[in-house]
């Protein structure tokens, strides 16, 4: 049983590594080297700042949800737990615990029932997805109002399927009213900061793309970011790298972005999370030490 659990723990990073290696075999090393040599690292630095602000907003979104669930939680505690979760996801690939589970356990240590704590983390995740869909739908409507067509090189059926998925996800919060009005109120209480957090994340991604000199339409990238970031939840990544890079290449090459730039832009975004995870590592280690000494 223990061996099976250990094997399961390594499936996700192994799949992520396989995805990255598969992508690398499809890219041109010489072109990747050229892109990196001409990269504008000031954009990457700005991306790190924006990504950090995005995670800060995510932590405050989660705090608002937890408070609506009836658990007192200070902003500082929420921020510490959230960034420790980033460490668990990025610096400890395939390791002891995932970021969402870490946050759930953190709330349970503060006295919150574990099931309710897990619900708050799940609703926090869902709120982020809804915000991505809302921004994508808004970008699509703006493109229509501005009379700009969608220059997407993909089968029409796939475009319709993607659009339908975005629309459905944008409307799914309405289903919470039938499931639990309490959940809907908790989601609405953090809606504004949730949209802000996702807008900051998209801005960070755009900065990463600009760092590797990708040329793109901002509104079209906002439209496609829902698919790119949602792909990141697929359990096939190592340290946060894998499924997002595959989705980035898939979606962005459809709008004319060079495959190498799409891949490297996504990798740069992942490195902003890795940097934040490393900065939060001392806090994570201290918490682990306190648990052992308790």
Feature-to-residue mapping (PLM):
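Transmembrane helix boundary and interhelical junction motifs in multipass membrane proteins
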Residues: 56-61, 94-103, 233-248
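Helix-loop junctions at the membrane interface of multi-pass solute transporters
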Residues: 68, 94, 104-110, 252-254
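Membrane-interface alpha-helices at helix entry/exit sites of multi-pass transporters
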Residues: 76-80, 95-99, 109-126, 257-268
